[in-house]
Amino acid sequence: MPGRGRCPDCGSTELVEDSHYSQSQLVCSDCGCVVTEGVLTTTFSDEGNLREVTYSRSTGENEQISRSQQRGLRRVRDLCRVLQLPPTFEDTAVAYYQQAYRHSGIRAARLQKKEVLVGCCVLITCRQHNWPLTMGAICTLLYADLDVFSSIYMQIVKLLGLDMPSLCLAELVKTYCSSFKLFQASPSVPAKYVEDKEKMLSRTLQLVELANETWLVTGRHPLPVITAATFLAWQSLQPADRLSCSLARFCKLANVDLPYPASSRLQELLAVLLRMAEQLAWLRVLRLDKRSVVKHIGDLLQHRHSLVRLAFRDGTAEVETRGKEPPPVSTVTGDENISDSEIEQYLRTPQEVRDFQRAQAARQAATSVPNPP
């Protein structure tokens, strides 16, 4: 307040009290000089006027992280480090986990669901950054059931309102094929089964693109299709030594799991290749089957676009044409009965009507006269 002495700097008597947080100060209103500062401690009489604030109404409860959430955040970071993801991926996955954990349905969920939530947040982050990681790979690391994981994954995506991009098949093929143990000789892999990585990867990509163009990938898990395409690519590079090797043995040599639908995808790919081979005259005379067509995969892929167009567009139209029998052609002799209503459609003038009536009457009279004996 004014009247409490003078400012030592400017000599003004306009001194006012100003509370800086909990510390009172005497400040000159003219120059802003702090004349005196109060102490931070309070007297016993001041403390008697204070009120107790319950913990539930303070900010400390909202800032505290439960043990379950702390454990989940550690699991997210550990999983990102095991997968060797960039640091930005780890931060994004942690943020998604914290957002999901704010929902009461997630906080009250069972421990199994919270464990799966860790993998879902990491998978969402990888999908958004186009990082080639499959749901099956995370399920293997977490020992989680694939059906349970997929249902919780869709629930989290919907809960957080995320827009997930489609998985890039090319990047997934590169990552998945790199894990095959077929690129260097070992006691478990004979020399005739060892293949160059770049050649095998290039042909596998072409076969996967062929499967995508012929609707073998849409709505299906990608790994069985990639496994079948990798097997065919590996066989076609050295068919003389590898045609006798089965898909199950191939997966065992490559040290990868055999997906259950991979055998069905293999048969579908072979059926597509056979239809393409029928469009080449020099292959049509060889009467290829699903075993021998593997030898000519390189030639078929070289002309893939034109052969697919011929096999699945013109071929479909031809099948539809064969299925429909042409209507029988009736021979017109001129003796067919023509109804009166049809004849009247062709009469235009009154003279034509009169001529038609006279001709009709003469015909009736001729038919009513009996024939002479």
Swiss-Prot record:
Q: Return the Gene3D superfamilies for the record.
A: 2.20.25.10, Cyclin-like
Name the GO cellular-component terms. Answer: nucleus; transcription factor TFIIIB complex; transcription preinitiation complex
Under InterPro entries, the record lists: BRF2-like_C (IPR054078), Cyclin-like_sf (IPR036915), TFIIB (IPR000812), Znf_TFIIB (IPR013137)
- Could you give a single Gene Ontology term from the biological process aspect? regulation of transcription by RNA polymerase III
One Pfam family, short name? Zn_Ribbon_TF
For the region Interaction with target DNA, give the residue spans: 108-114
Q: What range does the record give for the signal peptide?
A: none
Q: Where does Zn(2+) bind?
A: 7, 10, 28, 31
Q: What does the PTM comment state?
A: In response to oxidative stress, a Cys-residue is reversibly oxidized to cysteine sulfenic acid. This impairs formation of a ternary complex with TBP and DNA and down-regulates expression of target genes in response to oxidative stress.
**Chain positions of all zinc fingers (TFIIB-type):** 2-36
Q: Which domain of life is it from?
A: Eukaryota
- Which family is it part of? Belongs to the TFIIB family.
> Which function does this protein serve?
General activator of RNA polymerase III transcription. Factor exclusively required for RNA polymerase III transcription of genes with promoter elements upstream of the initiation sites. Contributes to the regulation of gene expression; functions as activator in the absence of oxidative stress. Down-regulates expression of target genes in response to oxidative stress. Overexpression protects cells against apoptosis in response to oxidative stress.
Q: What is this protein called?
A: Transcription factor IIIB 50 kDa subunit
Q: Which organism is it from?
A: Macaca fascicularis (Crab-eating macaque)
